[in-house]
């Protein structure tokens, strides 16, 4: 029967329990009525098959659907809304949901992130704990970043990290599928191998610092025009080269002499192309001329990379021209001019002679690994608790704000959210970031830390975050 929203209700016979226990792993989707379970199922399987309507009780039976993710095959079981102490028809629906739990390999417990945890959700948690099945807590309807941050309050259910998802819009669904693949007890069948393409590297720097010379060093041919005249490269030149036994997609970019806003003519368009190359890359190699003073324009280029959130390797080129005196002054310049990015990986090399060029590939790998690092929430909060106990926030106005908990909101670059009882001093925020890097690395990668001060929850409802 056609529904008002244009979706079609399928007459699917109820499967036997044996169908859930074969070699294909099974994921059961459970939760109280109308939290968006069927919408999530449709998102996971990549097509509209589960019946969806914005009223409770549309799904009554447990219905399996075939699905795949990154070449892995599994089954998703949609269930009706679970309620404690249900009667008559609702009791039968709840029983079907409990059967799906007992026959599944992994359970997705879906909670409405907008409403938050309810008494029914807490009762469902007790049922899930009795099943002893692996449970992934899904905070659905996280349609924007504000709701996504609020979803972290669902830690109170005691099921571990809540994964914010918008089943309707697809937000967070890829990350959730990755988590599901990690939790399945047996490796799903590999349908096809989809190798990752070469990592993209942008070579950036002001004119005549040796970007094209370095590119040609790797490519083994005169791939980019090299001239002693500054600015001979205008268009980005892509080259697929092998560095350290691995293929890399290198983008050589026009040298930047001026701010993009102040450049004109050819320089203006070259600057825009360079900015686009940085955005398209995963990691940037910023070349500086080691024989010259670190300039304001060098720092602007570094800012372009960090503002874009890309992994960063700083290569001091023309090291063959550096004598002992220049090394002394360069060390002082690094301390003074690059103090805001002490986390950047630094190399001293010579594209002309080949000195230390072999160190670039390990540096790129390390920077990218840091860029993609994820810290488990439990580990993050255990570390943070110890840090705050050892060095609490200074008292201001007779009170000291507390860091309630933290979560990593994303990677590439790593992004963290601190939920606090009040605003944190800028100095304490820098202290937390420094200690976070000391503990977990992130060498070669920027990290972002957002602070979410919260009001106390009053008797009338949920608290709200400032900002």
Curated annotation (Swiss-Prot):
Pfam families: KH_dom-like, MMR_HSR1. Keywords: GTP-binding, Nucleotide-binding, Repeat, Ribosome biogenesis. The keyword Cell membrane does not apply. SUPFAM superfamilies: P-loop containing nucleoside triphosphate hydrolases (SSF52540). It comes from the Bacteria. GTP 1 binds at residues 31-38, 78-82, 140-143. GO terms for molecular function: ATP hydrolysis activity; GTP binding; ribosome binding. GTP 2 binds at residues 205-212, 252-256, 317-320. Residues 373-455 form the KH-like domain. CDD domains: EngA1, EngA2. One of its GO terms (biological process) is ribosome biogenesis. The keyword Repeat applies. Residues 25-188, 199-372 form the EngA-type G domain. Gene3D superfamilies: 3.30.300.20, P-loop containing nucleotide triphosphate hydrolases (3.40.50.300). Belongs to the TRAFAC class TrmE-Era-EngA-EngB-Septin-like GTPase superfamily. EngA (Der) GTPase family. HAMAP family: GTPase_Der. Associates with the 50S ribosomal subunit. GTPase that plays an essential role in the late steps of ribosome biogenesis. This is GTPase Der.
């Amino acid at each position: 029967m056609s529904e008002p929203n244009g979706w079609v209700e399928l007459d699917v016979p109820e499967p036997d329990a044996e169908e859930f226990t074969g070699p294909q792993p099974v994921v059961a989707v459970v939760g109280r009525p109308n939290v968006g379970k069927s919408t999530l199922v449709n998102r996971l399987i990549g097509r509209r098959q589960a019946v969806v309507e914005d009223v409770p009780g549309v799904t009554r039976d447990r219905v399996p659907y075939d699905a795949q993710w990154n070449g892995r095959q599994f089954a998703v079981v949609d269930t009706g809304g679970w309620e404690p102490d249900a009667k008559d028809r609702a009791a039968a629906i709840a029983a079907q949901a409990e059967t799906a739990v007992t026959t599944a390999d992994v359970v997705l417990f879906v909670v409405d992130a907008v409403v938050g945890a309810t008494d029914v959700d807490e009762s469902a948690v007790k049922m899930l704990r009795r099943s002893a099945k692996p449970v992934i807590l899904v905070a659905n309807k996280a349609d924007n970043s504000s709701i996504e941050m609020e979803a972290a309050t669902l830690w109170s259910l005691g099921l571990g990290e809540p994964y914010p998802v918008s089943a309707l819009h697809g937000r967070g669904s890829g990350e959730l599928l990755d988590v599901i693949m990690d939790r399945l007890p047996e490796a799903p069948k590999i349908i096809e191998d989809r190798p990752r393409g070469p990592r993209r590297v942008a070579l950036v720097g002001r004119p005549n610092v040796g970007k094209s010379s370095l590119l040609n060093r790797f490519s083994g041919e005169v791939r980019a025009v090299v001239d002693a005249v500054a600015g001979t490269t205008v268009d980005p030149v892509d080259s697929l080269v092998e560095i350290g036994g691995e293929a890399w997609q290198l983008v050589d970019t026009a040298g930047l002499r001026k701010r993009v806003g102040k450049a004109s003519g050819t320089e203006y368009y070259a600057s825009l192309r360079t900015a686009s190359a940085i955005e398209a890359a995963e990691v940037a190699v910023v070349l500086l001329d080691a024989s010259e003073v670190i300039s304001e324009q060098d720092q602007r280029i570094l800012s372009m990379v960090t503002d874009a959130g890309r992994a960063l390797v700083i290569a001091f080129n023309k090291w063959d021209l550096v004598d002992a005196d220049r090394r002394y002054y360069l060390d002082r310049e690094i301390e003074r001019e690059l103090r805001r990015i002490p986390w950047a990986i630094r190399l001293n090399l010579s594209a002309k002679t080949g000195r230390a060029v072999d160190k670039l590939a390990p540096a790129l790998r390390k920077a990218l690994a840091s860029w993609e690092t994820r810290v488990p929430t439990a580990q993050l909060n255990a570390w943070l608790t110890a840090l705050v106990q050892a060095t609490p926030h200074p008292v201001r106005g007779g009170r000291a704000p507390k860091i309630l908990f933290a979560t990593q909101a994303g990677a590439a670059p790593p992004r963290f959210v601190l939920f606090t009882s009040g605003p944190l001093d800028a100095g304490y925020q820098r202290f937390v970031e420094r200690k976070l890097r000391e503990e977990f690395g992130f060498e070669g990668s920027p990290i972002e830390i957002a602070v979410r001060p919260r009001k106390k929850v009053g008797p009338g409802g949920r608290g709200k975050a400032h900002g």
